[in-house]
């Protein structure tokens, strides 16, 4: 069973018998191009958790650079590594537990869609530990995030644009 987790409210309008998106609001900054990773050192906070997948970010040196930039910003940094492709409920809940213990101000997801999807769901459970996956699947029924932590996504692939959407695809393998 897959959960399509909704972590933020999205507004859309339906046209004359045809689904049309008449407005797309993106109230956050998007940095791109050479040097954009360096913007991490401008984040304000005390603690950041870096959520990554299978190791390509580490092998290519991006994980070390991101960690160093966050430390330059004066933050204590914790790594959550090993998010699998098609992230599981178990991985999300494990990450949420780590976040509850560490209490980050920033959640930084790096990699493809899987670590970003997982980190967004972890963020929801970090901010609202009593919520269930079933609660998160109800459209337009989730409280605002950003009360405990802010979220940054660093995508390494092009795909579903999870870095700019309010959705996560999480798989229940049970």
Residue ranges and their predicted role:
Residues 78, 108, 150-154:
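Hydrophobic/aromatic beta-strand patches that form the interior of the parallel beta-sheet core
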Residues 104-120, 156-162:
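Glycine/serine-rich anion-binding loops at beta->alpha junctions
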Residues 96, 115-128, 164-165:
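Short Gly/Thr/Asp-enriched flexible loops that form oxyanion-binding sites at enzyme active sites
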Residues 66-69, 124-126, 169-170:
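Glycine-rich, phosphate-binding/catalytic loops in enzymes
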């Amino acid at each position: 069973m897959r959960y399509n987790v909704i972590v933020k409210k999205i507004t859309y309008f339906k046209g004359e018998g045809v689904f049309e998106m008449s407005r797309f609001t993106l109230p956050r900054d998007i940095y791109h191009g050479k040097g954009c990773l360096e913007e991490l050192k401008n984040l304000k906070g005390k603690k950041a958790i870096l959520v990554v997948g299978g190791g390509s970010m580490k092998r290519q040196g991006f994980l070390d650079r991101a960690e160093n930039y966050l430390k330059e910003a004066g933050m204590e940094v914790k790594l959550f590594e090993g998010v699998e492709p098609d992230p599981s409920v178990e991985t999300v809940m494990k990450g949420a537990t780590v976040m509850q213990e560490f209490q980050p101000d920033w959640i930084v997801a790096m990699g493809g869609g899987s670590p970003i999807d997982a980190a967004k769901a972890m963020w929801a459970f970090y901010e609202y530990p009593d919520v269930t996956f079933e609660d998160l699947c109800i459209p337009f029924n989730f409280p605002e995030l950003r009360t405990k932590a802010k979220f940054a996504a660093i995508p390494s692939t092009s795909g579903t644009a999870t870095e700019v959407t309010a959705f996560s695809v999480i798989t229940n393998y049970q």
